[in-house]
Structure formats: C-alpha cells, structure tokens
Amino acid sequence: MAMAKNVVVIGAQWGDEGKGKIVDWLAEEAGGVVRFQGGHNAGHTLVVGGKKTILRLIPSGILHESLDCFIGSGVVVSPEALLGEIDELNAAGVKNVEGRLKIAPTCPLILPYHIALDQAREASRGKGKIGTTGRGIGPAYEDKVARRAIRAADLLHPEKLREKLDAILAYYNVQLQHLHNAEPVKAEDVMAVIEKVALRIAPMITDVSRVLNEKNKNGEKLLFEGAQGALLDIDYGTYPFVTSSNCLAGAASAGAGVGPQMLDYVLGIVKAYTTRVGSGPFPTELFDEVGAGLAERGHEFGSVTGRARRCGWFDAAALKRSIQINGISGMCITKLDVMDGVETINICVGYELPDGGKTDILPCGSDAVETCKPIYETMPGWRESTFGVKSYDALPANAKAYLKRIEEVCGAPVAIVSTGPDREETIVLHHPFA
C-alpha cells in the first residue's frame, strides 16, 4: 500500500496568520491532527457555520467528530488549561473529546511554579519586556532542557512525585523570593493541582509516536498543526523577542515523533498584510490610519490574551526567510478581504542596511532587523469586496495581481486563498493533500 500524503501547516510570519481555520478545513481529509510544539499561549480561532470556537492546546481537528487528535512531545501542557478546554468543548456539544484526544507521555507539564516565575520575571524586566503571555511556557521549556521537568507520564504515579517536586521548588522559590521579591510556591498547592488533574488526564496518555507511524503505514493522511509563527522561532526568529520552541516545519518530526520523510507538503499560512504581537522589531509596521484600518477590519486582537496586534504592510523579504527555513511547498494567503478598499498597497521587497547595502531577505536576530529600513514596491489596490469569494476568477484583477506579485517576489506558489473566517470561505488553487 502506498504511504499516505502528510501535510505540515505552519505560520510563516509572527503568528496569528489564521492557521486554525485552515487546519480545521484540511482536517476533512485527515486521519489524525497533531500539535507538535508550543503551549496554550496562542489561540486558534475556528468559525464553522457562524459558530466561533477558540482552541489553545487541543488540535483544530477536534470539531470533526470522528477524528483522532494528538498532542506530541514537543508541546508543553498545562493540565488545568487542557481540562478547561475539554470542558468548554463538551459544553458546546462536541462529542467524545476525551476519547479522541491522545497525549504523549513525554510532554512536559506546566505547573503553578512555572506561571509564578514567568510573571515575576516579566514584571521585573520593566522596559525590557519580551512580551510573554505569562502562562509559564518559557520556564516549562527551560525545565525540559535542564532535565527536571515533570512530564505527562508522571501523572500515572502521582505518589512518586513529591520528592521530585521538593527539589524543583527549592530551585524555583530561591528565584521567586530573592530575585523577584515574589511569594514562594507551596508543594501542597502544586500536589493539589496534580491530584485534581491526574485521574482525568491519565487515560489520554498514549504512545503518540507509535500510533502516528501506524496510521501512516495504514494509508491514513496526517495533518501536523504548528503554533505561533516561523519568525518567532527560538533559533531563527527575531531573538530574544521569540517564543521558547522551534516553530518550523522541521519541528513536526521531533515534536510528534515521526521521521522527516513522513512530512510530504509544507503549507505556510501567510496573512495578506503583516502583524506582530508584543515587543520586537517590525520593519513594515504602520502608525497611520492605514494600519489602524487593517487592525479594525482584521479584528487584530489576540484570541487568548486580547492584546492589540501591531499591523504593517506585507513583508516579502521576511517571508523569503520563512520559505527558506521551512521548505514551504505552497502558501495559503489569509485575510485577503481585509485589504479591500486600500487605495495603494506597498509590498516590502527588501531592506536598506545601515552601511548603505541592501538585502532581499530578513536578517537573523533582533539587533540586525531593528536597523533594517523597508524597500517598497507600490501596487494599486481594489475597491471591490473579496469577502466570501470562493473562486479565483471572481477576484478583482488587482487582487489577483497582488497575489501574483507575492508569488514572484517570494518564490513560492499560492495554493489557497482565504476570504473570510468560515471554513467555506476558501479558494483552492492546489490542494495540499492532492
């Protein structure tokens, strides 16, 4: 039997590109959807039949009621956030969530001391804030690398955890009390959380790597769902204004426990303009009424944090870096409709550097990006509405010209165009599973 085709969906900018909708749409054809990195620091918003659902940890395929969903080892899991999300889905009438959700035993857990340290550190930074969501993601990844993490498998034996926990809290409380003048975390409080969640989470703990490899051998298509965006990647993003995990397509292999040869197609999700949340350099950021208009029409507020997103022109030079480090096979352009009515559109095709030189690709690291001045190409916009358009031919001529120019400058084909939040409001030029 020929192996099935598998697709990785990643955010190709600074996150918030609209991955959730596209994963939900692609899930129709999948035998499993897998989260492979990140935590509950970013929300994936789905709109089905006008009904809105925000997921943070659970893969966006969960609304398809016969579909198995997986949380791989690369994800840091807040047990309380996970159960809260399951309860929300149950209340919304989604069937058999706990029966269909499988969690790798090797997932590090986010516990109260991670959140306490994350928030205390950010408060101490003053003007040097990184823009963390304060949900404990960074400290949980630190524990993983320092080999002191409490992992999902530990929930199967909570009675053995106390000794391990005492050693961890000694480390955390020294920092909380002496570096940040914050309250210490009590072992009893952490154990209370662990005991509360262990019984419900234990049945979901599964050898995710093995199940995914078996599904692949059986010819089932798999969908790997990235969180955040490539330009927030811990290695290749605008460091230190980045997230704590690898957000690239290659991370799907390690974070889900599958070989890289199982990743057949990389779909990069790309907004028709650029946004960024929190601190960090943003060469094409707009501070005028055009930027304010994009924010308003695009509802640019974080689905989890409620934070306003910064808006700017499309940055093809930044996207080039993303295409390079992810091996993007095709792009899905989202929120094209938000550009309706913008009279003149700028596309950033490169940057001027402080030494007078030029580059056509985003440099690595925050200091280098901070000094970049965008070089723009100008195109005429369109007045007609693209909202809800379902065929490429029905798009305004200038909208098609805009998409074509993005392809030419970035060097990757447009496979899908999203013209609204509902899964039906989608134009398909090339299906990733085809």
From Swiss-Prot:
Q: Where in the cell is it found?
A: Cytoplasm
Which PROSITE patterns does the record match to this protein? Answer: ADENYLOSUCCIN_SYN_1, ADENYLOSUCCIN_SYN_2
Name the coenzymes or cofactors required.
Answer: Mg(2+)
Main location as per UniProt:
cytoplasm
Q: Name one GO biological process term.
A: IMP metabolic process
Q: What keywords are assigned to this protein?
A: Cytoplasm, GTP-binding, Ligase, Magnesium, Metal-binding, Nucleotide-binding, Purine biosynthesis
Pathway(s): Purine metabolism; AMP biosynthesis via de novo pathway; AMP from IMP: step 1/2
Q: Which residues bind Mg(2+)?
A: D16, G43
* Ligand binding (IMP): D16, E17, G18, K19, N41, A42, G43, H44, T133, R147, Q228, T243, R307
Q: Which domain of life is it from?
A: Bacteria
Per the entry, the cofactor note is: Binds 1 Mg(2+) ion per subunit.
| InterPro entries recorded | Adenylosuccin_syn_GTP-bd, Adenylosuccin_syn_Lys_AS, Adenylosuccinate_synth_dom1, Adenylosuccinate_synth_dom2, Adenylosuccinate_synth_dom3, Adenylosuccinate_synthetase, P-loop_NTPase
Which amino acid positions bind GTP, per UniProt?
15-21, 43-45, 309, 335-337, 418-420
Q: Name one Pfam family in it.
A: Adenylsucc_synt
| CDD domains assigned | AdSS (cd03108)
- Recall the GO molecular function terms of this protein's record: adenylosuccinate synthase activity; GTP binding; magnesium ion binding
NCBIfam families the record matches: PRK01117.1, purA
Family membership noted in the UniProt record: Belongs to the adenylosuccinate synthetase family.
Provide the protein name.
Adenylosuccinate synthetase
- Organism of provenance: Neisseria meningitidis serogroup C / serotype 2a (strain ATCC 700532 / DSM 15464 / FAM18)
What are the leading ranks of the lineage?
Bacteria, Pseudomonadati, Pseudomonadota, Betaproteobacteria, Neisseriales
